[in-house]
Amino acid sequence: MSATEELLGNAQHYATDFGKGDLPMPPAKRVAVVACMDARLNPYGLLGLAEGDAHVIRNAGGVVTDDVIRSLLISQRLLGTQEVILIHHTDCGMLTFRDDDVKAQVEADTGVRPSFALEAFPDVTGDLRQSLARLRASPFLSHLDQVRAFAYDVETGQLREVN
């Protein structure tokens, strides 16, 4: 059985006892979390979130990109979130390569060089600070007074705040 088939079976089981169809669209805690997509990082478990509590936006590295700004704009301006939590983590795959090297390999394989930034970074703390700066510089976000950044340690499960 493929992983997808297994997950579809899990989804059927989940639906049999589903009782959350009346959750409102705006998140109850009025918070958005931007986190890395790494499978070792579970924002819901880490932060004690349940369905309906928060918007969780994930990408490679948890990097603040134009698409993250787009999602946060909708989250804040249309759905009422007022706080943002950024989470990067130790031992991140984004620490292991350089954008230009991967772009060159993709171009060699496909004949097309990606036009977008992969956003690899050499330092978790430095990239969290850059992500904070990108958020604070955005004219599109309406709530920037409650933006905090954290580095998650994949070995200990602890969060360390980055200013």
Name each region found by the language model:
Residues M1-P27, G62-D67, I74, L78-L79, ...:
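Divalent-metal-activated hydrolytic enzyme cores
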Residues H13, D17-R70:
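Conserved beta-strand-loop surface patch within small alpha/beta domains used
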Residues V34-C36, R58, I87-H89, F150-D153:
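Short beta-strand segments
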Residues M37-R40, T90-M94:
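Gly/Ser/Thr-rich loops at beta-strand to alpha-helix junctions
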Residues L79-H89:
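Ordered, amphipathic secondary-structure segments that act as subunit-interaction surfaces
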